[in-house]
Amino acid sequence: MISLIEKAPYIPYPLALYEKLEQPHTLLFESAEIESKAHTKSLLMAKACLKLICNHNIVTITSLTPNGGAFLQKLSAFFKTPIQDNALILTYTKNKKTQDEFLKLFEPSPFDALRGLFKSVKTKPKHPFTLLSAGVFSFEMLNFFEDLPHLKAKDNTVHDFIFYLAQNLIIIDHKEKSVEILGACFDERFKTEIAQELQDLKELAKSIKSDFVPKKSKQSREVSANCSDSEFEKRVLSLQEEIKKGEIFQAVLSRSFYMECLEGLSAYYHLKLTNPSPYMFYIKDSDFILFGASPESALKYNALTNTAEIYPIAGTRLRGKDKQGNIDYDLDSKMEFDLQHDYKERAEHIMLVDLARNDMARVSKKRYCDKLLKVDKYSNVMHLVSRVVGELKKGCDSLHAYRSFMNAGTLSGAPKISAIRLIYQLENQRRGSYGGSVGYLNSEGSMDSCITIRSCFVKNNRAVIQAGAGIVLDSVPQNEANETRAKAQALIDAIRKTSL
């Protein structure tokens, strides 16, 4: 592999730059500090050279560029599998005989296809982000590893996973006010071509002098749902009966809201403006658009320190606002105090922190919890949050840790598998991207990902906004229905702002 690296003048308008580059198989990841809301980094995948799709036990790797085709040949040799119709098709069989939970992590799985992207490259990249894969793990990725039913996709059709390998990447550091443009070349024949692509990106970045200007279209402002309040409340009561029977302690029940969405990038602009979050993302595939502003880390792994982090969020209150919709700081402080001292919310949160600690225990030799029961605030809601940290055991990597963790207890329940079975029965359709994760893996072995919440899946100009609520024995059904709408509201408002 040949690493190509260019420096460029700082550009404070990543979305304006991405607008010029937006096409299928591109993405924009951004981050903002929780307290100050200041933007910290932006990562733009300007061109992908490979696309990886996982459906059940089959991973299909397709080249998107001639450079990607050269790498596909090397992957074919690495996996000892021939290329068929410009694609590498890898099949994985689940070993049902292994009983040890730790040993299960090392059984062959579709995750090995992602590992192969990095293991097959013998030359260490000059920059850890020159070789980078980014994408989406669906909620149903778990089904390969656990004995769970396979549901049909009705709204959100994201595959078990879909990842891209970057050919051209732009990293903007808003703190350091620096820009790096990276290229991954897998054959000497394409070095000149990719070097020119980086120069073109550099010139394009220099030309961006102002921020993104959102667009508006004639579209309906109406919102519908796949489940009415009354039906959702019945499902809450059904889960509470299972809790009384001792089947589960908690489950996260969700429903979907639907809107017309013709201007996805503009809706993302409004979302990140009103709801700056640690994880903001816009992914454009050939089949769909996925964007969001997630407050919750799925798994963050630093290969240099060998530490993994999980950031459980559970416990929600509306922000304190006046009649005009502005923050009333006295009322907001009262809402924060009420959240921190609510027995039901605290008990639910501590239970999910314990679940996160147990997930971390499978792969870590040392672990601890800090920032216990802290409050993070966003545009419409505030949350109780904690942070669980662990040092991974020898032989474990980021994907072993992710396998141990998925799916987040804050999006499934406790006990996790029992809760998911009940969720599948009640929701009766694939969640797709919702409750899964969006993130990246780089060549040094690090991973950063967020839980796919506060997100919108758009296909054929139809937006699907899914939101859930944690159900425990003390839950008030109407309150839980209201909570799902409150969590979806930031997305609904963002899309409405793109309507004429």
From Swiss-Prot:
L-tryptophan binds at S31, P278, Y279, M280. Its EC number is 4.1.3.27. Mg(2+) binds at E348, E483. Its cofactor is Mg(2+). InterPro entries: ADC_synthase, Anth_synth_I-like, Anth_synth_I_N, Anth_synth_I_TrpE, Chorismate_C. It catalyses: chorismate + L-glutamine = anthranilate + pyruvate + L-glutamate + H(+). Binds 1 Mg(2+) ion per subunit. NCBIfam families: PRK13564.1 (NF010079), trpE_proteo (TIGR00565). Heterotetramer consisting of two non-identical subunits: a beta subunit (TrpG) and a large alpha subunit (TrpE). Belongs to the anthranilate synthase component I family. This is Anthranilate synthase component 1. The lineage of its organism: Bacteria, Pseudomonadati, Campylobacterota, Epsilonproteobacteria, Campylobacterales.
